[in-house]
Each structure stands twice: as structure tokens, then as C-alpha cells.
Amino acid sequence: MTMKMSYRKSNIYLSLVNSYMIDSPQPSSINYWWNMGSLLGLCLVIQICTGIFLAMHYSSNIELAFSSVEHIMRDVQYGWLIRYMHANGASFFFMCMYTHIAKGLYYGSYKSPRVTVWTVGVIIFVLTMAAAFLGYCCVYGQMSHWGATVITNLFSAIPFIGKDIVLWLWGGFSVSNPTIQRFFAFHYLVPFIIAAVVIMHMMALHTHGSSNPLGITGNLDRIPMHGYFVFKDLITVFVFMILFSLFVFYSPNTLGHPDNYIPGNPLVTPASIVPEWYLLPFYAILRSIPDKLLGVITMFAAILVLLVLPITDRSVVRGNSFKVLSKFFFFIFVFNFVLLGIIGMQHVEVPFVLIGQISTGIYFAYFIIIVPVISMIENVLFYIGRVSK
């Protein structure tokens, strides 16, 4: 008698879903910090779906952009809900993403054999920041206009060709109609690129499987994804939806900027030009360097420095679960990152400039100096502890 394989395993398409979402073996010890991946997937779906519906009513003409957003809010049925879901969805996307990155830093998810997973994740992070900036400009409020002006002007720091690049980006001599139209075109396109890179991220993860809080091989104790971790993910999905709904329905503008409810005016400069809260730490790093070119290089380096962790972390044990020194400096790093975000909101004046420069130094020191030094010290301590036994 021949045994018949279940349809979910025999079907060429369902077998992929089965291998990733149902029978995928996961370490039994993974905790709720591993739920951020599913929440990020939910955020991406929310952003793409709401974005498609917003694009049906949005006009990228600079004369109509701001008015079309107000039209969505006032005249389109449930337009206010779609717009607030999209705006707050971006903030929740970054909340989950920063938590996901912090989990990776704490538990050593960047170490071999998951270097590819980490690298692709950093690419997703960069693309998400680009999509967020482009979308913020599409509203064409006062902060959108000046944010677009300031950030695109950064390219003028490139020697010889910088000014030509800025004019090419603008499509004119200032942020104008061609700028907003091309920004909207790319803002619509980038999320689908992110979705494709997310699939690559999952493929790379599927090769070696998830890491675990203990930092040891999880091949000896794994359980299927469905029935255990799917239900566990649903718990955080419900908690996420409750918190998300509280912001969307009761406090939709808390995470935004009030100046963006004023139409963009190139003749009036705001008292303080700041991006959305999730870009503030990197904006603070940019402003902490007096030289324009060095500031731009430092800001981009602050993102790309995540890629050096697989090289600089020399620890023989993955993750910080059993490392006192690494835990201490990790939480110093988290506090410093939050401080950079607060500094990014302030005016460029004493003492915020000095604090920003010190925080920037600590930020880079963590990746380039602290992690390799602490990892080598802890390696010696582990060796001494093993020999003494």
C-alpha cells in the first residue's frame, strides 16, 4: 500500500508555504523578541494596502498634493482611516524594526552562519528609510517641503558633481513639481522592492534557521512553526493591533509634526527643520559634524556600520545572554541611541551640539572599539573559567 503525501506538501506552490510557515523547524527556546519579524511583515502589508488606496485619490502635482491629502481626509469614504493607518503604520513599522535590530544586536543574530540574513536585513532598513523619506515629502506640508530641500541638498556636498546632482534630483532650481512627482513615483515603487528583498531575507533565514536566546545550535531541539509559534505570533499581533488602533482612532497625530498641516511654502522657513521621529538619531549624527561632506559621510556610515559587526565581534559565544560586560555596554548603546533621537529634535545650539558630538562618538565606538575589545576580554574570561574547572 502506497502512502499518499498531503496536498500541502505535494503541491509545488503550497509546499513552499508549508516549508516556511507550517513545518519549518524552529528552536524551542525562542522568546517573544523573535515575534518582531511577523509584526514587520504585518506592517509591510498594512503600508502597501493602504498606500495603494491612497494613491487612487492622491495627486502628485505640487499645486494639488496638499489639497488632495485633505480631500482624502474629508471627502473620500473612510479616507481619514486609510490615511491615519498609513501615517501611523510608518511609525509602528520603525518601532518594530528598531526592536528587531536591537534583538539582533543583543542575541548576536549577525554572526556566522547568518551573515547573509543580517546583510539583507540592513538593505531592507536602508530601503525602508528611503521609502519613509519619499512618502513624507509627498504630503507637501511645510515640513515636507523643507525636509526635502535639506536632505536633497546633502548631495551638493559631493565634490565637483554635487550641485549638478541636486539640480537633477529637483528637476529644476528648487523643490518643485517634478521633484514631488518623481518622489511619489519612487515612493510607490520602493515598498514592492522591499517586499522582494524581504523574500530574500526569509530565504537566507530558511537556509540555516533561526538563532535562539541561548546562542547555541538549535538543531537538537526544534519544533514545527505551525501550532506553536504561529499561535505565539498571533498573541503579539493582537497586542500590536490594539496599540495601533489606539493611535489611529484616538491619537492619530501624536507621532506626526504639526507644521505639516500647513501647505508647503518656500518663502517661509520653519523655526526648526526636523524629519519624522524615526529618522532623528541619524539626523542628529548629520548635524553633529560641522563639515557638510563629513556630516553626510558620517550619517550614511552610521547605517552601514551595522555591516561590520560580523567582523568586529570576535566572541566565541553568540549573543549577550551570558555576558555581563556585553549586556552593560549594549544598554549604554540603546540609551545613547535614544539620546541621539532627543538631540535631533533640538535646535542647533549649546549644549545640544556638544552632546550630539559625544553621542555620535559613543555610537561609532560601540561598533568599532567596544564590541571587539569586550568580546576579546570575555573570550579570555570564558577560557579561564573553562580551564579552572
UniProtKB/Swiss-Prot annotation:
Alphabetized UniProt keyword annotations: Electron transport, Heme, Iron, Membrane, Metal-binding, Mitochondrion, Mitochondrion inner membrane, Respiratory chain, Transmembrane, Transmembrane helix, Transport, Ubiquinone
Co-factor remark: Binds 2 heme b groups non-covalently.
Binding positions (heme b b562): H86, H187
Membrane topology (UniProt): Multi-pass membrane protein
Disulfide bonds: none
Subunit structure: Fungal cytochrome b-c1 complex contains 10 subunits; 3 respiratory subunits, 2 core proteins and 5 low-molecular weight proteins. Cytochrome b-c1 complex is a homodimer.
Protein name in the entry: Cytochrome b
Source species of the chain: Vanderwaltozyma polyspora (strain ATCC 22028 / DSM 70294 / BCRC 21397 / CBS 2163 / NBRC 10782 / NRRL Y-8283 / UCD 57-17)
Taxonomic lineage of the native organism: Eukaryota, Fungi, Dikarya, Ascomycota, Saccharomycotina
Gene field: COB
